[in-house]
Regions:
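N-terminal secretory signal peptides and thylakoid transit peptides that target proteins
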Residues: 1-15
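Residue-level signal for alpha-helical transmembrane segments in multi-pass membrane proteins
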Residues: 15, 19-22, 123
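C-terminal segment of N-terminal export signals and the immediately downstream linker at the start
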Residues: 22-61
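Basic/polar, acidic-poor N-terminal "presequence/leader" segments
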Residues: 33-48, 97-113
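A short N-terminal beta->alpha junction/helix N-cap motif
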Residues: 44-52, 64-72, 106-110, 124-131
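Amphipathic alpha-helical dimerization/protein-protein interaction segment
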Residues: 55-93, 142-146, 155
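Internal amphipathic alpha-helical repeat/solenoid segments
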Residues: 82-111, 132, 156-157, 178-179
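Aromatic-rich carbohydrate-recognition surfaces in CAZymes
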Residues: 108-136, 140-187
Length: 187
């Protein structure tokens, strides 16, 4: 399992890579990236099975892939960049407000810090895609609900009635809380 620190570090590396791509570092003239062309088939879920789609993100994938000379790197970008939207978000409207629960790893729980890190790469696209903007508002709304439930917890369940396996920890565990280990970077 990947640590949160490594996840955030890798997200930063991906963001730097995106900026490098846009600055022509990976221009097609770069002979170091000229490999034999292979068929790289998308590993993304079929469109009907994706949790969320964004027209702006999809357009960016097409645009950026064209700028990446190495077909394998282009394929990796196409599969990795939209992964949070494709597989980990649960977006709905609750009481007239957007609500977005983001699974942050292999555990069905939402960490405040990690859910922020997962949607961070999509922030530049919210002006182009109102639906994506609603998804981001939903994350903020969900995080607010979580903090109001317990400002000292760091990971929460979608269902605020669910009881954690850590319910007997020597802390004030409540239903809806997966883990109560306050982290300063959750703020």
């Amino acid at each position: 399992m990947q640590s949160r620190r490594k996840f955030i570090k890798n997200t930063g590396i991906l963001s730097a890579g995106l900026m490098a791509i846009q600055s022509q570092v990976f221009a097609s003239e770069a002979s170091v990236f000229n490999f034999p062309v292979k068929d790289f088939i998308s590993k993304r879920p079929p469109l009907a099975e994706r949790k969320f789609t964004s027209k702006a993100v999809e357009a960016a994938i097409v645009r950026i892939k064209k700028q990446i000379a190495n077909p394998e790197l282009a394929w990796l970008f196409e599969n990795c960049f939209p992964n949070t939207l494709d597989t980990t978000v649960d977006f709905e409207i609750i009481d007239g407000k957007p609500d977005t629960y983001v699974i942050t790893g292999d555990i069905d729980a939402m960490w405040l810090r990690d859910s922020t890190a997962q949607i961070w790469p999509y922030l530049p696209f919210v002006k182009e895609d109102a639906k994506l903007g609603e998804l981001v508002k939903g994350v903020i709304n969900r995080q607010t609900k979580c903090i109001l439930l317990d400002p000292y917890a760091n990971a929460f369940y979608k269902d605020f009635d669910k009881v954690s396996e850590w319910k007997n920890d020597l802390t004030k565990m409540k239903p809806g809380i997966h883990e109560r280990k306050w982290e300063i970077d959750s703020l």
